[in-house]
Amino acid sequence: GLMDPVRDSVPSAVKEAYGAGIRVIMITGDYPNTAQNIARQIGLKNPEERITGDELDKISDEELKERIKTVNIFSRVVPEQKLRIVNALKSNGEVVAMTGDGVNDAPALKTASIGIAMGGRGTDVAREASDIVLLDDDFLSIVQVVRVGRRIYDNLKKAMAYILAVHVPIAGMSLIPVILKTPLVLLPMHIVFLELVIDPACSLVFEAEKEEADIMERPPRTSEDSLFSRKTATISFFQGLSVLVVVLAVFLMSYYGGDSETHSRALTYTTLIFANLGLIFMNRSWSRTIFRSLELPNRTLWYVAGGALFFLGVILYLPFGQNLFKFSPLSFTDILLCLGAGFLSILWFEVWKIFHQRHLH
């Protein structure tokens, strides 16, 4: 007899999809027994239950809505019936990704939350009606797309959290000296230098960040979930606030301790740069500590951090840099103080990560 074996990649892809909280439903024109046999081979859940195309024609939409909550196999189904299945899933609040390749699949592909057409054997009509076209017609590619999408979402969220956090101390140190009637800490060229660190950090460092180990073990987000939630905004704000408190303390202790204006400014600004770099390292992951995050390679991170430290050295120790930024050179002890203060400003969030992970597990 003839045999059309399942692709080797499909069972593992189905398992990974289940781990990511994605339900997999098989809609086929095959006979029920054939469909159930394939379902068992690929590891589909609940292969005992099925609905045939004839049954689908006989049951009402309300009954279909109830039965589709547990049935994952639809056999002897014609393309026109896919639209009913999509509508039943969507009426239950599901986000539906539908695959198809034929002309008659177009209505279901268009109605689904995400239409996925086959690029190899799919028709032009199916491709036009879809949101995504699979070049290799492989189910594994769909799971890989989910992984990439979650990584991009994570990295956007991290970049936005970092942007909010880093601008809190910048805004604070621009305003507070005016209120206290002390010399200005941040002059225009200081803010420009900070932005030269912030922009590549957001556009390059977080973009190049690898996905976290548990990215395909998380439940899917709902369509109502915000990219930048209140919880994320609150944590980011407190990251920035803690940096502001520490940097302001360094400035006030230095200035009222009798240091010159240029020395106080250099000390405060260097602390802010170290804290800024700390925020970049810290926001690479909200579940792994800084030291564990270093296990994940990101060459761009080291270019940005190295460049920032190099140019910080230039403006601290070369005469033209000192004149331009109104700095005086710092001693080795001063640098250690700035480094310690910068690390102290982000320490609480590292502790939060540890306790948060313990709570989750």
Regions found by a protein language model. Give the residues of each.
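Membrane-embedded transport module
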Residues: 46-98, 112, 117-287
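Cytosolic catalytic headpiece
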Residues: 1-104, 110-114, 156, 178, ...
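Alpha-helical transmembrane segments of multi-pass membrane proteins
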Residues: 194-198, 271-279, 308-315, 341-349
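Short, Lys/Arg-enriched, Gly/Pro-containing loop segments at transmembrane-helix junctions
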Residues: 212-219, 290-292, 356-361
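Cytoplasmic-side transmembrane-helix entry/capping segments in multi-pass membrane proteins
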Residues: 292-301
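Hydrophobic alpha-helical transmembrane segments in multi-pass integral membrane proteins
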Residues: 173, 246-248, 307-323
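Residue-level signature of transmembrane alpha-helical entry/exit and packing/kink sites
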Residues: 187, 235-236, 301, 334-338
